[in-house]
Amino acid sequence: MARTSFAQLLVTQLRDLGVERIYGVVGDSLNPVVDAVRTTDGIEWVHVRNEEAGAFAAGAEARLTGKLAVCAGSCGPGNTHMIQGLYDAHRDGAPVLAIASHIPSAKIGTGFFQETHPERLFQECSHFCEMVNSGAHGATMLHIAIQTAIAKSGVSVLVLPGDVADQEVDGPLTRDLATELGAVQPAAGPVGRLAELIDEADTVMLFVGAGVRGAREEVLALAERVKAPIGHAFGGKEWIQYDNPFDVGMSGLLGYGACYDAMQEADLVILLGTDFPYSEFLPREDGRSARRIVQIDADASRLGRRVGLDLAVHGDVALTLQAVLPLLSSTKGHRYLHRQLKAHHKALSGAVAAYTKNVERMKPIHPEFVAATLDELADDDAVFTVDTGMCNVWGARYITPNGKRRVFGSWHHGTMANALPQAIGASKAFPERQVISMSGDGGLGMLMGELLTVKLHDLNTKILVFNNSSLGMVKLEMLVEGLPDHGTDHEAVDYAAIAEGVGIGAVRITEPKKLRKQLAAALATPGPMLIDVVTNPDALSMPPKITAQQIRGFATASTKIVLGGGVGKMLDMAASNLRNMPR
């Protein structure tokens, strides 16, 4: 049997499994792996400027393809950089293998140069994290790491000392891997009880998350059967909103439409494939004994952790609904559904649409107008990555899914700077598709070096910068807490000029009348392009339901700002947001 280095075995195994690239930054302890990539056909090394970006890119590729993606970092600071991207991938269920190279094995525990303990560091953001002690040991560890990442839809970390990577091993490894996983069949008892609860309720509302992927037809069939409005979290938007006659929008701080009210008014709320964390936007106890809440999820650990349940159903959403639909016997009226659909239409044509009407003369440009125009101009199968912060809001409210588009961000980890590196991963995975990074200037500033990565690999990535010289979401959070915004603004930056300095095509848009023409031209330009749109820093996102506490917070903050001499600032903010207030 031919002998080869463990690094070569690792790279060959990944290539044979279908992995086409490894994202990372080269470094001495990682050299055996990088050299194995160099000499192996069918797999490439994607050089990024920060290992954090490599982890984000791998996570994005895994989320888009559903297949294993790989990133790597050298010993010490190199692999510790990966942690934000790995947290993001792990919490969003992306199968990623991270290769964390390590100092020479004989030096571990001596306080050696760049020594850390990656086998401890990455425990919380992975399902599997182990150190390879020898080449022979590594073959088994590699198999377990890959299988665990695929089976549990999350991160595995392989800690690999550089000298171990160079050790010779027998090869090739011929272990089989289970890459086609089965779905969770629900038990008959909970399905029967679910049918009873649905039949007993006069009004039913469905609230869905990312777990309804692959269950669209079943969800719509249930809604039709029981005349139920369908609301969604951002993670469920791309799978359920389009061509949906039962859609009532989104709940949460990013929300819009009638989703919140529909949920509060229903006798029975069914949570489908969602781990929506904001319990204040979920059905609350109000003394109505008729209120019932059911949750259906393939991950039993998520059942009931956000809100108390009357029934928890462990099962795949599609299989569960297929099982329950034939058991239903009651007939529901249309009145509740029609009332919620009417309220949803009013909300969309009112506050949500306010910033996209008659805005051609308003400067700085309203960010909602930018997002709505982007939605109209982008390709039917475009991939949108959205930065955490206000870009999440604009993406949630104005980017329209159609079954072919993809829209995602840092849904659970909520880290800034995710959009650009995720767009890099999307562009590498699907070079023929239009990939658009909806970047906030705050997020872009954190990992701006990845513009060099976009240029180096000549990616067909469009980077749309919402340039408001402010951390907009942080400003909103401070105002809600009754605090005047402080430390959220910075001096104006010309990001188009920076991109041009890197060698990327760029355009700076400041005139609302020219937005559509300039944006269309930029999107149609082949290759990388940065679109720097100067937007209104005072545009705030109003949630679908404003609480008394939030009103008090705004009032307190406004008073403090005015007393501090900021009368003009408050007037600007009021003028920018008056039309967007819920009515």
Role assignments for model-derived ranges:
Residues M1-A2, A136, V159-L160, P172-L173, ...:
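Phosphate/pyrophosphate-binding active-site segments
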Residues L9-V19, A60-G66, H90, T148-K152, ...:
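Glycine-rich phosphate/diphosphate-binding loops that line cofactor/substrate pockets in enzymes
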Residues L10, R15, D28, V33-R38, ...:
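Active-site diphosphate/adenylate-binding microenvironment
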Residues N31-S105, K107-Q114, L253, A258-P277, G304-R306, V393-L471, ...:
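Thiamine diphosphate
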Residues R63, A210-V294, N402-R433, G445-G449, ...:
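Glycine-rich, anion-gripping cofactor-binding loops and their flanking helix/strand elements
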Residues A100-M141, G236-A343, L519, L523:
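Glycine-rich, acidic loop regions that bind phosphate or pyrophosphate groups
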Residues T116, I144, T148-E200, E238, ...:
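Conformationally flexible catalytic loops at phosphate/diphosphate-handling active centers
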